[in-house]
Structure formats: structure tokens, C-alpha cells
């Protein structure tokens, strides 16, 4: 059986993957999958840094399944701009977008989408709001207009949850439901009254429709943190200082048996 791992934001750094490779004694193959919970960092600057990062990931003999974050462009937009350089595939029994030069990197759909992973019904939810949006715009740093799900995408996703896929085992998102936002990690120089929390509010709303789930994992906040179970479900915030061995978690229903700390970038 292939192995599946989860990790948080990479932001264009291959070092956490290199450390994982060393920790894992180079035992993974391209049948094994590393799921990145947003802010992957491969489609940000559109120069040699992006391509160098994606090329280096290929050295570690894994397939990467990417949930889009807020600090990167939508793969669907890149595909529309460069139709000869991208294509669609099916992976985990669902639609993905692939850049031709990097076939080992699979991008989950830009809207809410269902997949089957290790026999589990999985919902992917990309995107988030950038709290440093106005600073990025002022400094001419990368900021992506379509970073969040649109209202139409959220409405469509909720409809599918209620009508097409009544049982969801695992939710993989970039940001979290409202109740799990780690306010102790918020940047002090950001006026929180100016922050758009519509996605977090939406995720909090749909969480009530998704219970009982087994696992909800997200990135975004740059810390790994295990939350108490709620209605049998395990909320988990992840950064790139740890991976979750999804096979072990599912076998034990114990997040601590699957969570492996190894590095901090």
C-alpha cells in the first residue's frame, strides 16, 4: 500500500522535504504522496526560483498533491494563460491540474472538490485571505486577486456537501474554521478589523454539516497544533516542522501516533 503524508506550508522551500527524506531513510517512492496544505510556493514569482523549487522536489521520489493557499496563483489561471504547458488528469479519483514539466506535482481543483484517499472520502478546500494584502500591494509584492474562494464557489461546494457527498471522512483545507483560528499567533501590526474572515466563517458553518468527520487538517498559521477532538473528529493545524502519516492515523485513530516532528523552517 502506498503511503500518504500531510505537511503544512512550504513557501517555496524544499528543505522540509529534504529533511523528511532523510528522516524517512529515502524509503519513499513516486507511489507515495505528500499532501501540502496550501502555500506550496511553486507558482508565486514565475521565474527560476519557482522552477528550481519544483525541480528539486522531483529528487525526493514522491508525488505531491497540492491544496492551493493564498500566497500563490490558481493553477486554473496559469493553465488558461499557458494551455500548452498544463493539462488535466485524474488523481485520487478526482480532477487535478498538472504542469507538463513537473508530472509528479498534482494540483487539487481550485474549487471545493471530492477525492478518495486510502479508502476515505476527502474534501479539499483551497484558498484563504492574505492578512498582509495591503502591504503586499503597496510594496509591489506578489498578491493574487482570486486567493479566496468566491461566494459562488462556496455555495456550490456547500450544495455538493449536502446533496452529492453526505459523508466526508477527511477535510483538507488551507485555512481553518473560525473557531480554530489561533489568535495568539496573529501578527500584532495587523489591524484585525480589516481582515476578511468570510472563508473561516464559511468553514465554521459547513463544519456542522460535515460531522462526524475523522480529520480536518489545515495549514496557513505556521505552527503545528493538535486541537481536542470534537464530535469524534480530530482538528489539526500543520506547519512544515512535522508530517502526519495518514496511514498510521487511520489505523490507530490517534493523531499522536501518526504525527512526526522533525524540522522547523
Question: Language-model segments: which ranges?
Answer:
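Beta-strand-turn-beta hairpins that frame and shape the catalytic cleft
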Residues: 1-5, 113-124, 167-170, 229-236, ...
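Active-site neighborhood of phospho(di)ester-bond hydrolases with catalytic His/Asp-centered motifs
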Residues: 6-8, 34-39, 64-71, 107-109, ...
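Core catalytic region of metal-dependent phosphoesterases/phosphodiesterases
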Residues: 7, 13-117, 192, 198
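A short acidic (Asp/Glu
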Residues: 16-18, 45-48, 76-79, 134-135, ...
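Short, conserved loop/helix-junction motifs that constitute active-site signature segments
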Residues: 27-28, 54-61, 165, 206-211, ...
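Cap/insert and terminal regions of metallo-dependent hydrolase folds
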Residues: 41, 52-53, 61, 65, ...
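Active-site-proximal loop/helix segment associated with metal-binding centers of metalloenzymes
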Residues: 92, 118-197
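Binuclear metal-dependent phosphoesterase catalytic core
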Residues: 205-209, 221-265
